[in-house]
């Protein structure tokens, strides 16, 4: 097993790099609800993230740095982490799903981190899956993990990437209410409950996207703003023909709480 070796210096450097990287490629990272996370007290805390793209890893990292006042860790396939060991310095550790011993090590290591008060960010679907595929299905690892840690709170996190009114796509994130599991819950029951919870958040996120209902989202990270691509082209042609600069500006219709921006 490859254990995490968190480095504050590497975390700070990676945060700056990833923030710039996301700003160049996306219009915004938007969060719903636009407020602090629901209180869970000192309970062990897990974030269960939908997994439609490799971008989810970076989105989870950015949210962990901005929303959670805890040390954060995330498991990764052992073969992948062996190739990119530098990620261990960001709080990533390995899991070998192909062996009983590997799963046992994962459960032991993760349980220890949770009991230390850390937050765990996990993609329980286990593989990249389209946002809107139904039903949502998890691998069994999360259910087994939750069953071993009485009192753990699990927050479902739905993530989608959509082109709306801008040339670059939006990252849209919907946080669900924490689900708390006490001692005695069966792993299969836990898995089904959390599958339904994440599916509910994905459906709510889909409905907001279809309705273009962005007023309830907060801007966590803002990229370069512009008008829609069509108007950009039309005004650019007009400016070229007339020789006059285009004075138009485009306002952000989404709330932008300063506590989230970085």
Question: Model-found features: residue ranges?
Answer:
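Conserved beta-strand scaffold positions in the cores of enzyme catalytic domains, especially
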Residues: 31, 74, 92-94, 154, ...
């Amino acid at each position: 097993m490859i254990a995490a070796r968190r480095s504050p210096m590497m975390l700070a450097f990676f945060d700056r790099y990833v923030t710039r990287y996301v700003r160049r490629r996306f219009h915004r990272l938007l969060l719903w609800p636009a407020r602090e996370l629901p209180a869970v007290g000192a309970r062990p805390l897990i974030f269960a993230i939908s997994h439609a793209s490799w971008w989810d890893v970076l989105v989870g990292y950015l949210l962990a740095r901005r929303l959670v006042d805890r040390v954060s860790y995330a498991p990764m396939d052992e073969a992948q982490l062996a190739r990119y060991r530098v990620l261990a310095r960001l709080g990533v550790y390995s899991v070998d799903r192909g062996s009983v011993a590997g799963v046992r090590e994962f459960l032991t290591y993760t349980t220890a981190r949770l009991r230390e008060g850390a937050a765990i960010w996990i993609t329980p679907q286990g593989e990249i899956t389209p946002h809107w595929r139904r039903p949502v299905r998890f691998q069994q690892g999360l259910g087994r993990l939750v069953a071993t840690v009485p009192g753990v709170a699990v927050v479902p996190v739905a993530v989608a990437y959509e082109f709306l009114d801008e040339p670059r796509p939006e990252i849209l994130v919907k946080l669900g209410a924490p689900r708390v599991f006490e001692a005695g819950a069966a792993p299969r029951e836990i898995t089904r409950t959390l599958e339904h919870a994440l599916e509910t958040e994905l459906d709510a996120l889909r409905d907001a996207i279809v309705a273009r209902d962005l007023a309830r989202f907060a801007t966590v990270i803002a990229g370069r703003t512009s008008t829609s691509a069509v108007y950009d082209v039309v005004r650019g042609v007009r400016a070229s023909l007339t020789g006059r600069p285009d004075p138009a500006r485009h306002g952000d219709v989404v709330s932008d709480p300063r506590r989230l921006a970085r």
